[in-house]
Structure formats: structure tokens, C-alpha cells
Amino acid sequence: MTIALGKYTKDEKDLFDIMDDWLRRDRFVFVGWSGLLLFPCAYFALGGWFTGTTFVTSWYTHGLASSYLEGCNFLTAAVSTPANSLAHSLLLLWGPEAQGDFTRWCQLGGLWTFVALHGAFALIGFMLRQFELARSVQLRPYNAIAFSGPIAVFVSVFLIYPLGQSGWFFAPSFGVAAIFRFILFFQGFHNWTLNPFHMMGVAGVLGAALLCAIHGATVENTLFEDGDGANTFRAFNPTQAEETYSMVTANRFWSQIFGVAFSNKRWLHFFMLFVPVTGLWMSALGVVGLALNLRAYDFVSQEIRAAEDPEFETFYTKNILLNEGIRAWMAAQDQPHENLIFPEEVLPRGNAL
């Protein structure tokens, strides 16, 4: 019995092969299959944001001016979240709320869901683009894995958190000052800075910045001289076989500074990947917890003692009072639809005031 082994080849290309050839062709800007998701979604997300910040008011959703047309600048303009009464509606243009009326759709906050959902899929498309290109040039996919950190933060903050609350209203609006408002809201209503997941996120992001600065400086300090251009970007050939900098010298330097140092480039660079990505993922997990209204650390014994002893105050009890102040002063401004009125006597006053 004879078995013939060989590679099967099709006589003519089908539609998939034709599309694959065109999408993955070597060109100045790579398209790829991931581009079918990335480019349209990124275009719509950015276009929706520019449209909203330029023309669309937030008067009907937040009682605010939020566009350049109304007098805002780059820092104060925003695409605002829909009203709380609309809960978690997708706010489709052709849905029951807007009924195909584009002006009404903008007034209701439809641009926010439009930007948020297209933005999320655009970020996912960008990660898939990194996977696709890495596979094409036979790289490992760690760039795409690293980009999962920002995606996790975006999805948790803009989508999962409001899904756990009463509506999209409690998500951040897309604007600089709007994000600042959201940060104050997170602190006042969730005591976010005392949340261990926030602490891990801060450690990851700031630790990554420190590692990046140290690594860049160390490489610059230990470059091998090679010709006249040793201190310029033309000093080395991108296809060179030899090292660009001296790992041995760098190891000796940091061993003297700290007593310990990385002795392996692979471990060093994996650590530089691990620190920020883990920090971002921990932050995202913390925000998912806040969506379920999980609490941060509570030091109840200090609160009880502060309530009983007029002379006792800690930075923790002071922060708790500040959070109460944020809630009392902010809720009425931030949620005008609730018609909240707080008498002067219920506003928090600490022992030190």
C-alpha cells in the first residue's frame, strides 16, 4: 500500500484568499484582518467625540454646558453620559428614545454610548492588530498582552462600573474636567484612595515609570562606542550582531548602588512588562469591585474614638470626614435630577474644625 504525502494546493483562489492577500499586503500602513474592526471603530469613536465636544450640550442630561459652541475650552468640553433616567439603554439612534431624530439623540446623550462602545471595540481591534502583526513577522505576542492592561482599565471604568450602578449616568464623561469630576466622585463615594487595588495600581504605574527611567538612563550610560556617531542615533546598525550596551557594566553599577541588580536581560525586561500590566489589571479589578459597591479599608476603631474624643483625629478620620463632605456637597450638584437638599446642620464638621 502506498501513501502519498504532500501539501494540498488549490487550483484557484477563493474570496477569502483574495481578501487575505489584499488585507495583509506589505504597505505603508498595515491593514490586516484586525483593521476591519480597528479602523471603522476608531474613526467613529474619535468622530463622535469631536462632534460632541464641538456642538453638543449636556443641558438635558447634566444641566451643564459641555461644548465649544457653548463657550467651553479643550479642558472643560466633554461628551457627557446620558441622563440617569435612561438607565442602561444602548441609546441606538433608531431606538425608542430618539426614534431616528439625530438632534434628540445627541440631546439624550446618545453620543456617549456611541463613543464608549466604538472606543472599546477600537482598543480591542488595536490589540488584535498587534497579535496579527506579531504572527506575521514571527514575534511573540507580549505587546498585545501588555496592551490588555489599558483595555481592562477602559472597559472596567467606562462600561462595567456603570453597569453595576443605576445607569450610564455614573460613568465618566469623555473630557478632561469630566474625568477629574469622576475621580472626586470615586473618592467621595467609594474612598478609592484607600482601596488596596488602587494602591496596587499606583505602585504598578509609578513603579513602571521608575523602571523605565532607570533602564533608559542605564542603557545610555553603558553604550559601547562604535565609530564617530557613538552619542547619536546613527551609531549602530539595526542588524548588528554585537551588543549595543554593556550589561556587565550595568550589573556592576547597580550591584554597588543597591546591593542587588538584574543579571539577566530577559528577566529585567519581563519585570518591566509585568509591573505596569499587573498594576493596570489590579486597578481594573478594583473598579469591578466598586461596581458592586465593595468597600475599601475601614478602620472603625479610629472612627469610634474620634466620635467620642473631641481631641482625637487621625489622617484617616480626617479623610472620612472629607469624603462625607464630598458626598454632601457634590451629590446635590452632581445629581440635579434627585433634587437633593442638605440642611447646614447635617454637613460634616470634624474635631479639628
UniProtKB/Swiss-Prot annotation:
Modification sites for Phosphothreonine: T2
Pfam family, one: Photo_RC
Cofactor remark from the record: The D1/D2 heterodimer binds P680, chlorophylls that are the primary electron donor of PSII, and subsequent electron acceptors. It shares a non-heme iron and each subunit binds pheophytin, quinone, additional chlorophylls, carotenoids and lipids. There is also a Cl(-1) ion associated with D1 and D2, which is required for oxygen evolution. The PSII complex binds additional chlorophylls, carotenoids and specific lipids.
Keyword terms: Acetylation, Chlorophyll, Chloroplast, Chromophore, Electron transport, Iron, Magnesium, Membrane, Metal-binding, Oxidoreductase, Phosphoprotein, Photosynthesis, Photosystem II, Plastid, Thylakoid, Transmembrane, Transmembrane helix, Transport
SUPFAM superfamilies with a match to the protein in the record: Bacterial photosystem II reaction centre, L and M subunits
One Gene Ontology term from the biological process aspect of the record: photosynthetic electron transport in photosystem II
Binding of pheophytin a, residues: Q130, N143
Topology class, membrane: Multi-pass membrane protein
Substrates-to-products reaction catalysed: 2 a plastoquinone + 4 hnu + 2 H2O = 2 a plastoquinol + O2
Any GO MF annotation of the entry: chlorophyll binding
Binding-site list for Fe cation: H215, H269
InterPro entries: D1/D2, Photo_II_D1/D2_sf, Photo_RC_L/M, Photo_RC_L/M_CS, PSII_PsbD/D2
Enzyme nomenclature, EC number: 1.10.3.9
Annotated GO CC locations: chloroplast thylakoid membrane; photosystem II
Residue(s) carrying N-acetylthreonine: T2
Residues given in the record as chlorophyll a ChlzD2 binding sites: H118
Binding site for chlorophyll a PD2: H198
Family: Belongs to the reaction center PufL/M/PsbA/D family.
Subunit-structure text: PSII is composed of 1 copy each of membrane proteins PsbA, PsbB, PsbC, PsbD, PsbE, PsbF, PsbH, PsbI, PsbJ, PsbK, PsbL, PsbM, PsbT, PsbX, PsbY, PsbZ, Psb30/Ycf12, at least 3 peripheral proteins of the oxygen-evolving complex and a large number of cofactors. It forms dimeric complexes.
Protein known as: Photosystem II D2 protein
Organism: Aethionema grandiflorum (Persian stone-cress)
